[in-house]
UniProtKB/Swiss-Prot annotation:
The presence of a 'disulfide through disulfide knot' structurally defines this protein as a knottin. One of its GO terms (molecular function) is sodium channel regulator activity. It comes from the Eukaryota. The record marks 52 as: Hydrophobic/aromatic residue important for potent activity. One of its GO terms (cellular component) is extracellular region. This is Nemertide alpha-1. It comes from Lineus longissimus. Belongs to the nemertide family. Keywords: Cleavage on pair of basic residues, Disulfide bond, Hydroxylation, Ion channel impairing toxin, Knottin, Neurotoxin, Secreted, Signal, Toxin, Voltage-gated sodium channel impairing toxin. Negative results: does not show effect on both human and rat Nav1.8/SCN10A. It is found in: Secreted.
């Protein structure tokens, strides 16, 4: 009886550790995506307005001001 209860405790511990590992991987992945997104933002205009940049040209949306990275520059 004691052996069975201790093995159940070990299983619970293992499941808990695997769950923690899984959560860690999910959060690490989201952090990586966030940092990549930050790099695609025009530092002068996009952060101030909180708007997204298009990934294709690295241009700001019309909510942002002029973006020197656009070709041609986005002046909407």
């Amino acid at each position: 009886y004691r052996i069975a209860s201790s093995s159940i405790a070990k299983m619970k511990t293992a499941v808990f550790l695997v769950g923690l590992l899984f959560l860690g991987l999910v959060f690490a992945d989201e952090a990586a995506i966030d940092s990549e997104f930050d790099q695609s933002i025009d530092k002068r205009g996009c952060i101030a307005t909180g708007s997204f940049c298009t990934l294709s040209k690295g241009c700001c949306t019309k909510n942002c001001g002029w973006n020197f990275k656009c070709n041609p520059p986005n002046q909407k």
